[in-house]
Design a protein with these regions (language model features):
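Short amphipathic alpha-helical interface segments
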Residues: 43-84
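Radical SAM/AdoMet-radical enzyme domain recognition
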Residues: 165, 169-185, 194-325
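Cysteine-cluster motifs in flexible loop/terminal segments that predominantly coordinate metals
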Residues: 444-492
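Short Fe-S-cluster ligation motifs
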Residues: 167-185, 481-519
Length: 519
C-alpha cells in the first residue's frame, strides 16, 4: 500500500512539475531518431541533446496526448523506476540546459532587419550584381525568362549603359565604407555578349576604389569563353560560375541555343579553357551551376555524377551548386507523372553519398560534398543559447540592399537576381534605396504575414525560406510560402538526422566546418 501511495505521489508531483513549467502548452521541439540513439532538438535554445530511450518515449507521449493518458501509455511499456528516472532527467535538462521552455515565437527581431536600417543601408552594402544585358544566345527549357513563366521578364534585347553601370559602382563606393568586403558581379542574360563592357566596368571600379580591394565575379553559360576571356578572368582573380547540367545527352536535352541545338560541346570547350588557364586555382575559382532535370531517377543522378569520369581533367574538389528547376519554369508537357516521380531524390542521394564518405565505406563526390558541407556548416555555426531566447531571424531573408543588390539594365534595384520581376523594387541608381518599400513590404508585411505560420514551427531558427519563394506574384504570397515550408521541414529533419549520425561516427570529424565562410 505504501509503495502504491509513493508511486501515486510521485506521479502527481510530476504532473505538477510539467504543468508548472509548461502552463498547459507544449514546448516547441523536434524529437527524432537515428539507428543508434534518440535526440531532442530544442527550438528555444537551438540545442541538440541525446536522450535515453525512456526520456524520449515519455516526451513523445507527453507531446502527443493529454498528461494522464501519456503517463499511462508510458507505464504500459516501462517500469515505474524508468518513469522516475525519465522525469528526473527532464528536470535536470530544464534546469541546466534551459530546454523544453519555448512555446512559440512572439517576434522575429533577431537579425539586422531590426537595427537602424537607414544607417546599415547607407554604409554596409557589400555587392553589386549588374544585369549586363537581357540578351542570351541560349534558350534553356527551364529558363525563368521564357515566355511560359509568368513571374519574370521575358527574353529581352536591352543592354545596360555604361552610365547606369558607373552610377551603380559609384553607389557601391559611397554606401560600403563600413563593409568588410566589396564585390561587383556580372550577370545576364549572357554577360559575355558584352565583354568590352565588363572590362570597362572593371577598370572604372579599380579607379573608383583605388585604395580599396574589390572582388569581381561572373555567372555565364560558358559558350562564349575564349582564351582571351579566360586570361582576363585569371588576371583579375574572377571566380566564374559556369552552367553545365551533366553529360552531353542530359545537358543538351534542356540547355539549347536559339536554334534548338545542344550546347554541351561549346560549354565544355569554354570550361576546359578556364580550367587550363586557372591551373591549381581552378578548384577554388570555378563553380559549376547544375540543374537537376526530369525524368528524375537514381540512375539519372548517377549519370550526372559521372560527368567527372567523362571529363577527367575536371578538378575533383570543384564547388558545385545543384538545384531543381525553379517552381513553374518547366514546360507543362515535360512534367508528366512518370517524369517527376522520384524513387531517390537528389537530397537523399547527397546525404547517402556524403555519409558513406564520412564513415569510410564509400567515395565522396564534388556534388554531395558541396550540397552537404554547406548545410552542415550552417548548422555547426548556428547560435546556441543558454536559455530560451524569444527572438528569431527573419527566416532565411537577407536584409534588402545590405549584402547585395541586383541592378537591372535600366538601373532599378532588386533584392537579388533570383527574385521575381514582379516583386517590389527597392530603389534605383539615380535616387538610391526606397527605404519605405523595404521597411513596409519586405520587413513589416513579411513579419506580420509569416509570424502566425512560423511561431509554432520547430524549424524557425533553421529556416532558409526567403523573399525568392514568397514574393513570386509581386507581393507577399502566404500560399507560396506554405508550399516551400513542406520541403523546408523535410530538409531540416534530414539535416538533424545526418548531423547526429555523423557525430555518432566521429564527433570531431565535422570541426573543419567551423572554418567554412558563410554568406
Amino acid at each position: 500500500m505504501t509503495g502504491t501511495l509513493e508511486r501515486n505521489d510521485y506521479i502527481e508531483e510530476s504532473k505538477l512539475f510539467f504543468k508548472r513549467i509548461w502552463q498547459g502548452k507544449k514546448p516547441i521541439v523536434k524529437l527524432y531518431k537515428t539507428q543508434s540513439a534518440d535526440y531532442l532538438y530544442d527550438t528555444g535554445t537551438n540545442k541538440v541533446l541525446k536522450c535515453k530511450p525512456n526520456v524520449f518515449f515519455l516526451l513523445e507521449c507527453l507531446f502527443s496526448t493529454e498528461m494522464d493518458k501519456a503517463i499511462a501509455i508510458f507505464l504500459s511499456r516501462f517500469q515505474e523506476g524508468e518513469f522516475i528516472d525519465a522525469v528526473e532527467k527532464i528536470k535536470v535538462a530544464v534546469e541546466k540546459e534551459g530546454v523544453l521552455l519555448s512555446f512559440g515565437a512572439n517576434q522575429f527581431g533577431l537579425s539586422s532587419h531590426y537595427g537602424n536600417l537607414k544607417d546599415l543601408l547607407d554604409s554596409k552594402l557589400s555587392q553589386l550584381t549588374l544585369e549586363v544585358t537581357e540578351r542570351c544566345p541560349m534558350r534553356c527549357l527551364y529558363c525563368p525568362y521564357n515566355y511560359s513563366f509568368e513571374y519574370s521578364r521575358n527574353h529581352g534585347e536591352r543592354d545596360m549603359s555604361l552610365e547606369v553601370a558607373f552610377k551603380a559602382i559609384d553607389y557601391l563606393k559611397t554606401h560600403s565604407y563600413k563593409s568588410d568586403r566589396r564585390a561587383v558581379t556580372f550577370y545576364g542574360g549572357e554577360p559575355l555578349l558584352r565583354f568590352d563592357f565588363i572590362q570597362s566596368c572593371v577598370e572604372y571600379t579599380k579607379s573608383v576604389f583605388s585604395k580599396t580591394s574589390v572582388d569581381f565575379n561572373i555567372t555565364t553559360n560558358g559558350i562564349l569563353i575564349t582564351q582571351e576571356i579566360a586570361n582576363y578572368f585569371f588576371k583579375n582573380n574572377f571566380p566564374v560560375v559556369i552552367s553545365i547540367d551533366g553529360p552531353k545527352d542530359i545537358h543538351d536535352s534542356y540547355r539549347k541555343d536559339t536554334h534548338g541545338n545542344g550546347t554541351f560541346n561549346r560549354v565544355v570547350n569554354g570550361l576546359k579553357t578556364l580550367v587550363d588557364t586557372y591551373g591549381d586555382e581552378a578548384a577554388n575559382k570555378i563553380i559549376l551551376s547544375m540543374v537537376y532535370t526530369p525524368p528524375y531517377s537514381g540512375e539519372r543522378i548517377d549519370r550526372i555524377a559521372a560527368l567527372w569520369d567523362e571529363l577527367p581533367w575536371l578538378p575533383k574538389n570543384l564547388n558545385v551548386n545543384i538545384t531543381y528547376p525553379s517552381e513553374g519554369t518547366m514546360p507543362a508537357g515535360i512534367l508528366s507523372t512518370e517524369n517527376v516521380k522520384e524513387e531517390k531524390d537528389l537530397e537523399r542521394w547527397g546525404i547517402e553519398t556524403f555519409e558513406k564518405k564520412y564513415s569510410g565505406t564509400g567515395e565522396g563526390h564534388p556534388i554531395s560534398d558541396s550540397m552537404e558541407e554547406k548545410k552542415l556548416a550552417m548548422f555547426m555555426q548556428r547560435t546556441i543559447f543558454h536559455e530560451p531566447f524569444d527572438k528569431y531571424y527573419l527566416n532565411g531573408c537577407c536584409v534588402p540592399g545590405l549584402r547585395k543588390i541586383f541592378v537591372t539594365v535600366d538601373g532599378a534595384f532588386r533584392i537579388c537576381e533570383k527574385i521575381s520581376s514582379k516583386a517590389p523594387l527597392i530603389g534605383n541608381v539615380f535616387e538610391g534605396f526606397t527605404l519605405e518599400t523595404i521597411q513596409k513590404a519586405y520587413i513589416d508585411e513579411y513579419e506580420q504575414m509569416s509570424l502566425p505560420l512560423c511561431s509554432k514551427c520547430w524549424a524557425i531558427r533553421l529556416c532558409n525560406i526567403c523573399y525568392v519563394q514568397t514574393f513570386r506574384t509581386g507581393k507577399f504570397d502566404i500560399d507560396s510560402k506554405c508550399r516551400s515550408c513542406r520541403g523546408e521541414l523535410h530538409s531540416k529533419s534530414r539535416l538533424l538526422k545526418l548531423f547526429s549520425i555523423l557525430m555518432e561516427k566521429n564527433p570531431d570529424g565535422l570541426n573543419f566546418l567551423y572554418d567554412v565562410k558563410l554568406e
